[in-house]
Amino acid sequence: MSVQVAAPGSTGLGPERLNPEELVRQTRQVVQGLEALRAEHHSLAGHLAEALAGPGPVAGVELLEEKQQVVNHSLEAIELGLGEAQVLLALSAHVSVLEAEKQRLRAQARRLAQENTWLREELEETQRRLRASEEAVAQLEEEKSHLQFLGQLRQYDPPEESQRPESPPRRDSLASLFPSEEEEKKGPEAAGAAAAQQGGYEIPARLRTLHNLVIQYAGQGRYEVAVPLCRQALEDLERSSGHCHPDVATMLNILALVYRDQNKYKEATELLHDALQIREQTLGPEHPAVAATLNNLAVLYGKRGRYREAEPLCQRALEIREKVLGADHPDVAKQLNNLALLCQNQGKFQDVERHYARALSIYEALGGPQDPNVAKTKNNLASAYLKQNKYQQAEELYKEILSQEALPAPLGAPQGGTAGDTQQQVLRRSSSFSKLRESIRRGSEKLVSRLRGEGMAGAAGMKRAMSLNMLNVDGPRAARTQLSQLSTRHLSEAPRTLSISTQDLSPR
C-alpha cells in the first residue's frame, strides 16, 4: 500500500503544495522512518516465528498466526512504500538533471542569440564597408580614366614647351563661348592660326582637344562626365600653373560653357567673372580675350533678362575691339549686333538702328552687299522696324534680302565643296543659311500679317502659304511681287504690339 506523508504543520484540510527540494527532504525522512519500521517488523516476525516453531503445544496459536499475518502484510506495505520512495527520489534526481540541462540549454540559447546579434551587426558593418569600398573603387576608376585621358592629351604638347620662354599675351581662340555661326564652323586649328596671326594668346593643343571632347559630351547630354573632366583639368592647371594663369581662365570658360548648356546661368556667370579677372591681370584690360569674356558675360546676363547690367559689358567689349582690331573689323560688327539686340530688349530703338546701320556699313564694305552677314543684319533691323510699326522700312529691307538670287559664303568661312558646286549649293548645306531663311520667314510673315490687317491671330493660318511663296530661295521674284501687292494695304490705325524677339544675343 502507498503511504501518504503529511507535511509538518499541516491542518489536514488538504495536501500543501511543496517545492521540489522540500518534497525530497521529507521523502528522505519518510524512507528513514520506513526502514526503522521495517526493522521492527522483521524483529516481531522473527519472535512470532520462534514462538510458533517452539517444541510442545503453544497456547494461543491462532492468535499468533493472525499476528504473524498482520506483521507480514505490514512488511509488504513497508517494502512497497520504500520502493515508491526510492522511485520518487530517483525521479527527483532525474528531474534535477533535466532541469540543470534545461538551464544549460537556455543559457546556451541566450549566448547563441547574443552571438547572432553580434554577427548581424558585424555583417551590416561589413556590408557598409563593402559598399563604401565599391563606391571608392568606382570613383578611383573614373579618376583613373580621366588621368589616362589627360596623360594622352600631353602628346599634343610641344616637346620643349616647358623650356620655352613665355610668349607675349596672345588671343584666346576658345574665349568666345557663344560664337556666331561662322565661328562655329571653324576648327581648333583655324582658330589657333587666326589667334597666332593676331599675336593673341595661343591655347595649348591639349586644351583645344579637351574643349572639343567636352563639347561632344555636352552635346550628348553626358554632363556627369563633362563636368568632372573639366574640374579635374582645372585642378591640374591650378596645381601646375597657379590660379592666375591664362590657361586656367580658358578652362573656366570651358566649364562655364557646360554650365550654360545645363541652363545654370548663375554658376556660369560666376566662372566668367573669375576668368575675366584673371585675363585682365595676365593679358591686360584691353586684350581681345578680355573683350570676348565681357561679351560672354553680357550674353549670360541677357539670357537671365538682366539687360541693364549686360549693356555696359557689351559696350566695353565693343570699345576694346575697336581699339585693338580697328573700327571696320568683322568682330566689331558682330559686337554691334549683340549691343543692338540688348538695346532692343530695353526699347532703345534709336540706338538699335544706329548700331545696326554701322554693322551694315562694315559688312558691306568688307564683303559687299552679297555677304550673308548683310542679310542677317538687315533681317534683324527689319525685326526692329516691325516692333516700332515702321512697316515701310521693314518691307524695303525684306525686299532687298529676298532680291538676292544667291548668297556667297560668309566672311572668313572655309570654302568647301567641289569645283562644280555653286555658292548657293554650298550655303544650302550650312546651318547658317537655314537659320537665316527661317528668321526671314518669321519676319516676313509678321510684316505681311500686319499689312493685311490680320494681326498675329492670322499669321498661323497663312504660315504655310507664306513659307512656300515668299521664302523659297529659288523663287524670290514671287516674294517681291507678294510684298509689292501688299505694300499699299497699310492699316489706318496702329496694330497691336508684337511679342518680343526670340533671338538670342548670338546663336548657340
Curated annotation (Swiss-Prot):
Stretch list, region Disordered = 1-20, 154-197, 409-441, 486-508
PROSITE patterns cross-referenced by the UniProt entry: TPR, TPR_REGION
Note whether Phosphoprotein occurs among the keywords: yes
On the tree of life, the source organism's domain of life is Eukaryota
Task: Write one Pfam family the protein is assigned to.
Answer: TPR_12
**Coiled coil region boundaries:** 88-150
Residues where Phosphothreonine occurs?
502
Task: Please classify the protein's predominant subcellular localization into one broad category.
Answer: cytoplasm
Q: Which GO terms describe its cellular component?
A: ciliary rootlet; cytoplasm; kinesin complex; microtubule; mitochondrion; motile cilium; neuron projection
Q: Does the keyword Oxidoreductase apply?
A: no
- What does the protein in this record do? Kinesin is a microtubule-associated force-producing protein that may play a role in organelle transport. Plays a role during spermiogenesis in the development of the sperm tail midpiece and in the normal function of spermatozoa. May play a role in the formation of the mitochondrial sheath formation in the developing spermatid midpiece.
| Entry protein name | Kinesin light chain 3
